[in-house]
């Protein structure tokens, strides 16, 4: 099942991508941390270090921290953010 709906692109999330190696996604409400981790690793061919999740007004957000060997900016480029 595809849990990732779309990347969230704001000034804050872009700074997080550049400085902290984190990518923020809008995800399905039924998504779990493990499911998001597996989907990000499979879809973007990266290693995920950590997943934080929160419920927001517009849905559920997942903040994915990539392992140091991988670049969130590169993944963002592949998604068309940059």
From Swiss-Prot:
InterPro entries: Nucleotide-bd_a/b_plait_sf, Ribosomal_uL23, Ribosomal_uL23-like, Ribosomal_uL23/eL15/eS24_sf, Ribosomal_uL23_CS. GO terms for molecular function: rRNA binding; structural constituent of ribosome. PROSITE patterns: RIBOSOMAL_L23. The keyword Ribonucleoprotein applies. GO terms for biological process: translation. The keyword Ribonucleoprotein applies. It comes from the Archaea. Pfam families: Ribosomal_L23 (PF00276). GO terms for cellular component: ribonucleoprotein complex; ribosome. Keywords: Ribonucleoprotein, Ribosomal protein, RNA-binding, rRNA-binding. Binds to 23S rRNA. One of the proteins that surrounds the polypeptide exit tunnel on the outside of the ribosome. Belongs to the universal ribosomal protein uL23 family. This is Large ribosomal subunit protein uL23. The lineage of its organism: Archaea, Methanobacteriati, Thermoplasmatota, Thermoplasmata, Thermoplasmatales.
């Amino acid at each position: 099942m595809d849990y990732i709906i779309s990347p969230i692109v704001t000034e804050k999330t872009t700074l997080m991508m550049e400085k902290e190696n984190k990518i923020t996604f809008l995800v399905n409400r039924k998504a779990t941390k493990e499911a998001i981790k597996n989907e990000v690793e499979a879809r973007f061919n990266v290693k995920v270090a950590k997943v934080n999740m929160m419920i927001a007004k517009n849905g559920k957000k997942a903040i994915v921290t990539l392992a140091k060997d991988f670049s969130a900016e590169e993944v963002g480029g592949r998604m068309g953010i940059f």
